Amino acid sequence: MKISPLAGKPAPPEMLVNVPRLVSAYYTGVPDSGIAAQQVAFGTSGHRGCALVNSFNERHVLAITQAICHYRVGQGIDGPLFLGVDTHALSAPACSSALEVLAANGVHVMLAEHDEYTPTPAVSHAILVYNRGRTTGLADGIVVTPSHNPPEDGGFKYNPPHGGPAETAITRAIQAQANHYLSRDLHGVARVPLAQALRAATTHRHDYLHTYVDDLSEVIDMAAIRAAGVRVGVDPLGGAGVHYWAAIAEKYGLDLTVVSEAIDPAFGFMTVDWDGRIRMDPSSPYAMQRLLAVKDRFDIAVACDTDHDRHGIVTRSSGLLRPDHYLAVAIQHLFQHRANWPADAGVGKTVASSALIDRVAARLGRRVFEVPVGFKWFVDGLFHSSLGFGGEESAGASFLRRDGTVWTTDKDGIAAALLAAEITAVAGRDPGEMYREITHALGEPFADRVEAPATAAQKQLLSALSGDQVHAKQLAGETIEHVLTRAPGNDAAIGGVKVIAKNGWFAARPSGTEDLYKIYAESFLGQDHLRRIVDEAQGIVDDALQTQGS
C-alpha cells in the first residue's frame, strides 16, 4: 500500500468536509435509480455512501426505512425499534428522516434520552435485554452510522430481533424493496413531518447510556480493574460513546481519563490515515497518533471508532497492538478466567484472521469456528452461547457475559477495550507483554495485507472461484495443505480463496467498492517467508483467474 505523506499528521483545514454543503446535498440530491453506484447497496454492515455523490441522500434513507417497515410486517415483528445514531454529520439528518417514516408506519421507536449519541453495542444490548424471555412483540433496531469511515460518509444498519447485523437474505430483501421505492419516485413510502413524528404516541425515549453502563459488570470484571488501580486512558475519537466513558468511570470507581470529549462532524482533530483520508480507525497507527502521544501516562490506553463497535488497544510495552494480536490475548484470557462459560463454547474467527488464534484455541482445548469476513456469521453462536468469543481481523469483537449468556450479538468496542484493562489488572502485565508470552510459546506470526488491481469481471471470477482452479502445489517452499473457497466453520462461500501451508497462508478477496482485490498473508517463519507468500499469492490468483476466464 502506498502511504500518503500526510499519514499520521494533523488533518489540514483544506481537507475537512464542508458540513453545511454536505447536509444540504443530503436533502437536495436526487439519486438516479438507473445508476448502480446511486442505488441502495447493503455491504457487510449496512448501506453506506456520500451525499455529495448521490449515494447517501434522504431518498435512500426514506426508501430503506420503508423497506424495513415492510420487512417487519412480513415477519410479524411488532415490538419497539431501537434507533441509534453516531456523530457523523449525516447521521442526525438521516435519523430524523427515518423517524418520519417509522412514525407514519406506526412503529414504536426508542430514541435516546436527551438526544444522546448511541453506540452500536448499546443498541444491540437494548434489543437483547428487551427481548429476553419474550416470544412475541420482539424488538429490533437501526443504527445510523458509517462506522469508522470518513466524515463525509453516511451509513444505515438494520439489526433484527437477534440484536446483531442482519443476515444476507434479510439485507437482500430490504435492498431490493428499497430500490423498488427509489425507482418509483418513493411511491409507497409513508412519511409524516418531523415535528409530528417527535410528538407521536409511538415515539419514546430510552436511557441507552445507563442501561448499558450499569450492566457492564456482567461482562467485565470491573472490581478487578478498580482494585488493581489500573490507570486507563480513553480516546473516543469523537464518536457515539463519547459520554459513556465518564459514566463508566463514575459508576465503577475506575481511574479512567478521557483524553478528549470533543465532537466535531468534520473530525478536524484527527490525524490523517494511511491513504491521505480522515478515518476514525482505532486499529490504524496513523489515525491513533493523539492517543499514542500520551500512552505513557496510563497503564493501558484504548480507543473506539465512531459507532464504538471497533476497538484499539495501546500498551506501554508495545504501543498500538495489531487487531489479531489483541484478539489472541483476549481469547486466552477469557477462556482461562470465565469459569461459568459453557465447556463446549468455541472461538469464532474469520478466514482473514491470524492462525495464531487457532494455536491459542488448540492449547485451550477449544474448537475454532472459522467463517467468512463479516460479524453477522457470529450472531447465532453468540446468541445461543455456542461461541464464547467472536472476533474479526478488523478490530471488532464481542463475547459472552461472565455467566455464559449472551451480551451483545454485534461488535462491542467498549467491552473489548475494557477487557484490556481487566487483563492488565488480573495478569499484572499489559496485553502487549501477554502477546509476547504467547508468541514465545506458540510462534510469532508476521502478517501483511496488499492490494492488486482487478477489473469488475476479474473480481466476479475471484468471488466465484473453486478450489480445483488453483493449480499450485507449493506456497513459499511448503506443500499446500488446503485450498478453501468455503469457510470450514459454516461452509459459507468466502467470496474468494484461501491457500494454507504448514507455516503460512494467504487469502484473496475482491474489494466491494474498488477495482482491486485484497491479499491477506501470514507467515510463522519470518519477514522473508512472508514476502515470498505475498509475491506467490498474486501469481497463484492471477493464474487461477486466467484459467477460469479462458
Question: Where are the regions that the model predicts?
Answer:
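An N-terminal, well-structured beta->alpha segment
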Residues: 2-100, 104, 135, 198-232, ...
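Phosphate-binding chemistry for phosphorylated carbohydrates and sugar-nucleotides
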Residues: 13-16, 21, 25-28, 109-124, ...
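Flexible hinge/switch segments at interdomain interfaces of large molecular machines
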Residues: 34-44, 189-193, 259-266, 512-513
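Short, high-confidence coil segments that cap the C-terminus of an alpha-helix
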Residues: 77-78, 132, 136-138, 296-299, ...
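Short beta-strand segments
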Residues: 84, 141-147, 303-305, 390, ...
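Hydrophobic or amphipathic alpha-helical targeting/insertion segments
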Residues: 126-158, 165-167
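Catalytic-core signal marking the mid-to-C-terminal active-site face
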Residues: 429-550
